[in-house]
Amino acid sequence: MGGGSGGHVTPVVAVLKELRARHPRVELRFWCDAKFAPQARATVAAFDATIPVQTIVAGKFRRYYHLTIFQQLTWPSLVAKNVGDLFRIVTGFVQSFFKLIIWRPDVVFTKGGYVCLPVGLAARLLRIPLVIHDSDAHPGLTNRVLAKWATAIATGAPLEYYSYPKDRTRYVGIPIATEFQPFSKSQQIAAKKEWAIASERPLIVVTGGGLGATRINEVIVDTLPRLQQSGSVVLVAGAGQYDELRAVMPANSDTFQLYPFVTNMHSLLGAADVVVTRAGATTILELAALEKPTILIPNGKLTGGHQLKNAVVYQEAGAVAVLDEDALLANKQQLAETIDQLFAEPKVTAAMAHRFGKFAKPDAAKDMATMIIAARRS
């Protein structure tokens, strides 16, 4: 189970595919929060429409990395939301408890996110084996709590970034779709033609994740003419921001395209010569598997600063370029300048992308499925 963003769901689907391949008659169910259910249903149904996608009441404990504890405790609306969500967590626990009693699964697998907390706690109480996966280099609160009782723990980044018990923890990477593999030059050209993009020009793909990224979109709006001097641009803006941007940006052509979201992201990313994105763990590993030159713009305001810590892992390895968001907003031309530098030094950029590719774990879904099967109760 998982929820809150596509980064929690798409890896689960990769694992579901592997489990179904090994055990065609296995009974699978996907649980998530109600807010994310429509997207989760679409993602799961693309693999197998017979897998039920069910919702769990859940609440999140809001914490903001850029605020002090005192500021958070004296923010009335924040305190009110956290208190209200405490009751939602209790409700979700009771709901999960009875759902698990009725279903009695052999294993509960959680991918992270606040919706997993009540389910994981209920599984613990019912002594159902629990396997958790942590994608981010900074473990989330839910996984830090559930790790105390988890039968097995899998991580998306190398083990030195975690304090989990070593005897129960394994670095498997992040399960991703098998379509995320390096594109040859001919495959890249074919992908550009598939997207009706000029194949003779470099392609810059900008994506803020499934929900979009307002501040990255703002930079693209303000610098698009400058970016188009460097190459064609495709902006995946997020469904909630698409209409506003469509009204102020050029019509789609072979040098610029705007989308709310795309379903075949591997094809679009494969067509790219450089990708600009947030530092979500799943997106990072998809790009690593493609060996794409990548510019990360982490959101420093998210819980625990986990995107900042994700970015550091790959920046320290010389595998990506990283831009500070505040500095970028102060000097929006910095993005185009960084892209130009990558294009101006093709050998250096190719070496960076190759180092990035070493983080890919093509067997992550298989390894994750093996851990789940090993944990099941007899």
Label each PLM-derived region with a short phrase.
Residues 361-378:
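C-terminal alpha-helical cap of glycosyltransferases
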Residues 106-107, 270-285, 292-293:
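Acidic donor-binding loop of glycosyltransferase active sites
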Residues 17-22, 31-32, 36-48, 60, ...:
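Donor-nucleotide binding loops and adjacent catalytic segments primarily
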Residues 49-104:
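Phosphate/nucleotide-donor binding subsite
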Residues 8-20:
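Short amphipathic alpha-helix
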Residues 45-50, 94-109, 117-131, 144, ...:
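Glycosyltransferases and closely related glycan-assembly transferases
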Residues 341, 348-362:
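A short, well-ordered alpha-helix in the C-terminal region of glycosyltransferases
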Residues 26, 50, 124-189, 197:
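Active-site-proximal region of nucleotide-activated glycan assembly enzymes
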